[in-house]
Amino acid sequence: VDFNVPIKDGRITDSNRIQATLPSIQAVLDNGAKSLVLMSHLGRPDGRRDEKSSLRPVAEQLQTLLGRPVTFLEDCVGPEIESACADPAPGSVFLLENLRFHPEEEGAGVDESGNKFKPSQEQVQTFRDSLTRLGDVYINDAFGTAHRAHSSMAGINLPQRAAGYLMGKELEYFSRALENPNRPLLVIMGGAKVSDKIQLINNLLDNCNEMIIAGGMAFTFKKVLDNLEIGNSLFDEAGAKIVQGIIDKAAERHVQIHLPTDFVCGDKFETGCNVQTYSGNIPEGFMGLDIGPELQEAMAQAIQRAETIVWNGPPGVFEIPEFRAGSERFFREIVAATRDRRVVSIVGGGDTAAFAKTMGDESDVISHISTGGGASDP
C-alpha cells in the first residue's frame, strides 16, 4: 500500500491515501484471508531508521478507520517479524515498519557521515526473501510507488499476485484518458528536476498535442535553451544534458512546448520575503518561485483549446502565499474548462493533488485526482 502521508508533530494531516486503500483491505478480510500484512514506505529516510518517518501513527489511524485492531510491527524483515506473521490469529491485520529504513528496499542508502552507498546483491536478496516469507498472496495497491523498481514492488517472489482495487481504478482511468484521449491533449508539467521526470516527459510527448513546462524544472530549460540568467533558482545539472533532446522530440512529434517568459521571484524561500517579478534575466540573490502573468495568460489560452488536460506538478511553491497565484490560476482555469466544456481533467502527482485539496469543494469538479505521486506520471 502507499501510506506515504504527511505527518506533523506525530499527527497525520491528510489521511486520503490511507482511506483510498480501505476497499482493498476490507475485501481481503471479508473474503476469508487468515491475516493481512501491510507494507509501505514513508518519506525518504535513506536506508536508516528515523522516528520522524515511522509508520506507527499510520497504524493508529488505520485501526480507527477499520474499526478493528491493527498490530504495528517494529521492523519489516527478520526472524521476529517472520515469526509474528507465520501463524497469527484469524483476522489479524499487521502493519510493518517503514520499508525504507532498510537500504535494500531502494537499493541505495546514505550512511551517518552522509556518504551514499549501495547494499550488495546478496543483502538485497536476503531482504526480498524475508518479505516473501511474510505471506502467500501478493497484492499491489500502491499506485504511488508502482513505477519504482524497489524490492517491495519487484522483488517479492509469490506465485499468486493481483492488483488492488485502487491500483485498478487508477490504471483504468489513466489508460482511458491517455490511450485514446479527446484532442487536443494538453499536459502541464511542474516539479523541480528534469532528470526526475524525463521518462514521463518522453512518454507524454508520444501522446500530447501541447505541453506547458513550469515549476523548478523550467529554469533548467531556460538556461540551456535561452542562456537565461536564473539567479539563485534551481538548476538541474543532470537534467541540463537532456533538455535539447526533449525539445528535438517535441519538434519531431509536432508538440507545441510552452515555457515561462516571466517569473515571480523571492530573495528567500519563506513568506514575508522581498518579492519581485522579472521578465527575462533573474538577478543574483533572487530565485524564481512561481510563474508570472505572461505564462498564466498563455496557459489559460492553451487550456481553452484543450479537450483533455493532464496536470502533473505545481508551477510554483504554493505552500508560501506569495508564490501561490500561478497554481491557483492553473487550477481555476482547469476547473472552469471541466465544468463548462466537459473537458477530461486529470490531476496527478503528490504535490499537485495536495494543492488541489487545499482548494476545497472546487476540487470535486476535476475529473480525476490521482492518489499517486510519481506513479501518476504516466
From Swiss-Prot:
As for family, the record states: Belongs to the phosphoglycerate kinase family.
Show the InterPro entries listed in the entry. Phosphoglycerate_kinase (IPR001576), Phosphoglycerate_kinase_N (IPR015824), Phosphoglycerate_kinase_sf (IPR036043)
Positions bound to (2R)-3-phosphoglycerate:
V1, D2, F3, N4, N16, R17, S40, H41, G43, R44, L99, R100, H147, R148
Q: Where does CDP bind?
A: G191, D196, G215, G313, F318
Q: What is this protein called?
A: Phosphoglycerate kinase
- Residues that coordinate or bind AMP: A192, K193, K197, G216, G288, E319
Q: Which SUPFAM superfamilies match?
A: Phosphoglycerate kinase
Any GO CC annotation of this UniProt entry: cytosol
Write down the species.
Condylostoma magnum
Positions binding ATP in this chain are: A192, K197, G216, G288, E319, D351, T352
